Swiss-Prot record:
Protein name (database record): Putative membrane protein insertion efficiency factor
Chief location of this protein within or outside the cell: membrane
SMART domains named in the record: Haemolytic
Location(s), subcellular: Cell inner membrane
Cellular component GO terms held in the UniProt record: plasma membrane
Taxonomic path: Bacteria, Pseudomonadati, Thermodesulfobacteriota, Desulfovibrionia, Desulfovibrionales
Family per record: Belongs to the UPF0161 family.
Protein topology in the membrane: Peripheral membrane protein
Function comment: Could be involved in insertion of integral membrane proteins into the membrane.
Keyword tags: Cell inner membrane, Cell membrane, Membrane
């Protein structure tokens, strides 16, 4: 269920990447682009944290920022093992 929800949330991002973004010149100052960052963050971290990371990234992407390489942060290790692992 979780993977399906993640894919559903990423669907509008993919629509933007393939249908809307090609109509405009490249403007993102970061690598990967903000849309690619959003899709990767949601798939890697889940919907809530992924959208939070994406929102922070989009707010940082403006004409006065330096830009550059800004990858999605790695998933932090779990502090406690889940009950299913025992």
């Amino acid at each position: 269920m979780s993977v399906m929800l993640r894919r559903l949330v990423v669907l509008p991002v993919r629509f933007y990447q393939y249908c809307i973004s090609p109509l405009f010149p490249p403007a993102c100052r970061y690598v990967p682009t903000c849309s690619a960052y959003t899709a990767e963050a949601v798939m890697r971290h889940g919907v809530m944290r992924g959208l939070w990371l994406a929102a922070r990234r989009i707010l940082r992407c403006h004409p006065w920022c330096a830009g550059g390489h800004d990858p999605v942060p790695p998933v932090p290790p779990q502090r406690y093992p889940s009950a299913q692992e025992h």
